[in-house]
Amino acid sequence: NSGVFVNPPFFPTYPHAGEQFYVTPPGSYELSSCAFSSKNPKTSSYSSSSSPPSLTATSKPSCTQQLGAATFYGGGTLSNFSTAGYGDHSTTSAGYGSMSQPISPTSAWDSRMAATYNTTSWGSTAAELGDGSYRGRVNALAAGTGCLVSAAAEPNNNHCSQVMSPCKSTSGYPWMPVAGPNVGLEVGRKRCRQTYTRYQTLELEKEFHFNRYLTRRRRIELSHLLGLTERQIKIWFQNRRMKYKKESKNKEEGVSGEGDGENETESTGTENAQTQNAVHGVTILEKPSSLVLHVDDTIALNTVRHS
């Protein structure tokens, strides 16, 4: 193989209109009529194993290009056929370079990127990242927007990893939940537990002692007097009524428990006495609980005394 690069667009396999197609033996290559004069359209082939003589052929100006010396099937040779973009494998072309040493796509891409973008700007950015001025500008920007910025790692090789916390946007709505470091704290409209002073508690207890249920007018008067809202006074009275109900219920349960215990002890004492008397054979007559005297009995008693 002589190493001649054959380009299919210049040398198609099938002939164009008006061309003659000749079958070539194995081991040879086809050349279109582009390499010859248009008056004599004829395809020829050259063998890859023969030595290259010299032959000059006329052709169209657009098709005259150098392919190197080649021997044609039919007895002629072609030399000084120059190409601008295609050359020998061993030679270096201006358009595509050496074919024996393929160009890496990565290097080609890097070269194009270097030509497209200014490398000095990247260098200045790297210098800024190294000296910390970039961090200062980011912090200043974060302070203006209300974001919290924390450096996760030191800038290295033009890469700076920053962890941005959720910003509190100025266009937010009050009903939107607040996310970020304040989660779990009292944020927004969450109410705290109301604490009452000793004076307020004393006045409320005095009012509850006389009136367990308040009217609207009295509630308004207490709110102005104690500096509380009507809702706070209403809730306090509700809680106080529940507390009073619970205390009274516990007191009733305690009294009923004590009475049951006394009755049980009395009954057990009488039963023990009766069992002891029955064992000894003694019969005790119970004394009547009350003596009822009629009128006749009183008259009889008086006569007995006077006599």
UniProtKB/Swiss-Prot annotation:
GO biological process: anterior/posterior pattern specification
Protein keywords: Developmental protein, DNA-binding, Homeobox, Nucleus
DNA-binding region, residues: 189-248
Keyword Metal-binding among UniProt keywords: no
Start and end residues of each stretch annotated as Disordered: 42-62, 246-277
GO cellular component, one term: nucleus
Location within or outside the cell: Nucleus
PANTHER family for this protein: HOMEOBOX PROTEIN ABDOMINAL-A (PTHR45659:SF4), HOMEOBOX PROTEIN HOX (PTHR45659)
The protein's name: Homeobox protein HB1
Organism of derivation: Tripneustes gratilla
High-level lineage: Eukaryota, Metazoa, Echinodermata, Eleutherozoa, Echinozoa
